[in-house]
Amino acid sequence: MNKLFSFWKRKNETRSRTSSDPSIGQGYKLREKDLKKLHRAASVGDLKKLKEYLQLKKYDVNMQDKKYRTPLHLACANGHRDVVLFLIEQQCKINIRDSENKSPLIKAVQCQNEDCATILLNCGADPNLRDVRYNTALHYAVCGQSFSLVEQLLDYEADLEAKNKDGYTPLLVAVINNNPKMVKFLLEKGADVNASDNYQRTALILAVSGEPTRLVKLLLQQGVELSCRDICGFTAEEYAYFNGFTVYPQFTASHGRKKHVK
């Protein structure tokens, strides 16, 4: 069994940080020579030039570059609030996607430009659009540890149980990033404590696979199910044992929890 679990653990370690994990702070990699004048002005926040270009018939407010980015995408990624407001006044498409299916809202949240994200939400941006990895704006907000952005997105009916390509809900993203405060916050907002990823790993299983003490205590307080198994049949207790988390039985006992294995 040790050999089987060791193989499965190695396999999952490579998958727990996959291309589907939302990463924050990543703006667009821009080469000036590849940008049209309109996009260049939006990316640097030059509102004066942007207005001049849009007065010319050859420029359209929704013009896309080779990677399907609009001026709104670039303004949101770079935090140019005044440009975002102007483009919306010009009736730009607010939910348009780039080559990675990212909407301007997703890009604003990913780059932690909260002012831009707030404007977009107030103007009707869809908080539940998914990028090519099925991450929503909420996944990125959780990864960026922005409680105010998470709160805003939930106020605009962001899906708390949305799953990316790995099956991670925002709660599971918070667990993987070892962020007890965000985990607690999401649970208080009604996140499913027993949600599981594509390998049927629950928050508790993922928690005992990392730096578990605070997270495990928190999840136990929330009544997490102890008997859930991953696709190989392992429970959180078995993950804890093989990861050297030897106090797990004491933790469950101290919270009055008994194991009822299915």
UniProtKB/Swiss-Prot annotation:
Keywords: ANK repeat, Repeat. ANK repeats lie at residues 67-96, 100-129, 133-162, 166-195, 199-228. InterPro entries: Ankyrin_repeat_domain, Ankyrin_rpt, Ankyrin_rpt-contain_sf. Pfam families: Ank_2, Ank_5. SMART domains: ANK. It comes from the Eukaryota. The keyword Repeat applies. PANTHER family: ANKYRIN REPEAT DOMAIN 36-RELATED, ANKYRIN REPEAT DOMAIN-CONTAINING PROTEIN 7. This is Ankyrin repeat domain-containing protein 7. It comes from Macaca fascicularis. The gene is ANKRD7.
